[in-house]
A protein has these predicted regions:
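Short helix-terminating capping/connector loops at secondary-structure junctions
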Residues: 26-32
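A broadly tuned preference for mixed-charge, low-complexity surface segments
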Residues: 13-17, 91, 111-116
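C-terminal domain-boundary segment and adjacent tail
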Residues: 99-130
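Structural recognition of the beta-strand scaffold that forms the well-ordered cores
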Residues: 34-38, 57-62, 90-94, 119-122
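Short coil/turn segments
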Residues: 40, 97-98
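Alpha-helical scaffold elements lining the catalytic groove of polysaccharide deacetylases
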Residues: 1-26, 42-88, 101-104
Length: 130
């Protein structure tokens, strides 16, 4: 089932507004950090075009930690590192509401550095990020 365009845009706007309010204390017409990931990567060409028209960059992921599955931080670390090694680079998806992920991230960052990977800080064009 696909959601009607107007409803999808309204849900996107609510999500962006919630993020803007939580991070910056206000909602702006153009988000301070104009990045978006569709839940479940469930986009379509019309929504992607609309986001581009609004100047919002849509991200996907190359590897994910499957952190929605029950597992401990050590198991999650082994899983995500094995997936990164297979592809060699890319955007990693974590869910920040998962406690095992929060516990695992420091070890993950140390291991990436040890293996020669680097973290890239993505900022909006024009330097809008605060």
């Amino acid at each position: 089932d696909s959601m009607p365009m107007a409803k999808a845009e309204a849900e996107i706007d609510r999500g962006i507004a919630a993020d803007e309010t939580a991070v910056y204390g206000q909602v702006r017409v153009t988000p301070a950090t104009p990045f978006f990931r569709f839940p479940g990567f469930a986009s379509n060409p019309a929504l992607l075009n609309r986001m581009a028209e609004r100047g919002i960059v849509v991200f996907g992921a190359d590897v994910w930690a499957s952190d929605w599955e029950p597992m401990g931080p050590d198991q999650e670390l082994r899983l995500i590192l094995s997936r990164i090694e297979k592809v060699g680079r890319g955007i990693v998806l974590f869910h920040d509401t998962k406690s095992q992920t929060a516990q695992m991230v420091p070890a993950f960052l140390r291991e990436l550095k040890k293996r020669g990977y680097r973290i890239v800080h993505v900022v909006p064009a024009g330097g809008n990020a605060r």
